[in-house]
């Protein structure tokens, strides 16, 4: 976990990892994508993120599993019932009709998911709660031989308990690092062996934010996922 990249670079990297190296992986792969649907994300950035997700999922191979989880203001109450899951067909039909049907269903489901998210974006952002849902997805599909987590967000945690825009534990990198380690211990998230890719979406939340806090927010997430056992 080195840094937070632009969402485009992150999605391109994941597409390459899940495509070009396919022959070296035994068994199905699992990809979980968390996408921030709060109103702090600029609409154009949200549109681009959904388009990129569509492209990445369409490149999956037979047997691969994908879950897309919205990042809302309360993951347990609002996000858990809105997860969409896809599994690429394993049994080939004539002329690859199964893949054609899969991609048509995929496109329709993503369009419905996006329309619902953009029609009524939430005012708050529970990224930590969404990560907990991602861990549940990985445990539910324990047979996958390779797992990856992609998070597309502005990474400004803002729920009923924590607000990265104001919390003094996000005022400097040193304090943020310590806070991240404490948070990882408190949440008990286990991502050992799971690479995590952080894609930064353009957000209204960063307007007027001091540089020290921006850097502290990035440091928090880098240290948090490292403390959770992420491998990259």
PLM regions: where:
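Von Willebrand factor
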Residues: 27-150
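Bacterial N-terminal signal peptides that target proteins for export
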Residues: 1-8
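VWA/integrin I-like adhesion module and closely mimicked acidic/polar interface patches used
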Residues: 156-216
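C-terminal motif of bacterial Sec signal peptides marking the signal peptidase cleavage site
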Residues: 16-19
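Sec-exported extracytoplasmic/periplasmic mature domains
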Residues: 54-62, 111, 132-143, 157, ...
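Acidic/histidine-rich, surface-exposed loop or edge segments in extracytoplasmic proteins
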Residues: 28-40, 110-116, 199-204
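Bacterial signal peptide processing site
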Residues: 21-23
């Amino acid at each position: 976990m080195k840094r937070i990249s632009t969402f485009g670079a992150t999605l391109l990297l994941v597409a390459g990892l899940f495509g070009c190296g396919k022959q070296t992986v035994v068994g199905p792969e699992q990809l979980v994508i968390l996408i921030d649907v709060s109103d702090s994300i600029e609409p154009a950035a949200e549109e681009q993120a959904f388009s990129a997700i569509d492209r990445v999922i369409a490149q999956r191979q037979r047997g691969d599993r994908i879950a897309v989880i919205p990042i809302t203001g309360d993951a347990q109450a609002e996000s858990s019932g809105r997860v969409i899951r896809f599994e690429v067909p394993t049994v080939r039909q004539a002329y690859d009709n199964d893949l054609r049907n899969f991609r048509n269903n995929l496109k329709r489901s993503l369009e419905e998911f996006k329309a619902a998210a953009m029609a009524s974006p939430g005012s708050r952002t529970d990224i930590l709660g969404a990560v907990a849902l991602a861990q549940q997805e990985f445990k539910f599909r324990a047979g996958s031989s390779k797992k990856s987590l992609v998070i597309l967000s502005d990474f400004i945690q803002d729920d009923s308990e924590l607000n990265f825009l104001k919390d003094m534990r996000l005022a400097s990198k040193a304090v943020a690092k310590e806070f991240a380690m404490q948070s990882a211990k408190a949440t008990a998230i286990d991502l050992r062996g799971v690479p995590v890719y952080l894609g930064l979406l353009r957000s209204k939340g960063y307007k007027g934010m001091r540089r020290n806090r921006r850097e502290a927010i990035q440091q928090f997430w880098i240290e948090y996922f490292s403390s959770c056992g992420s491998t990259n």
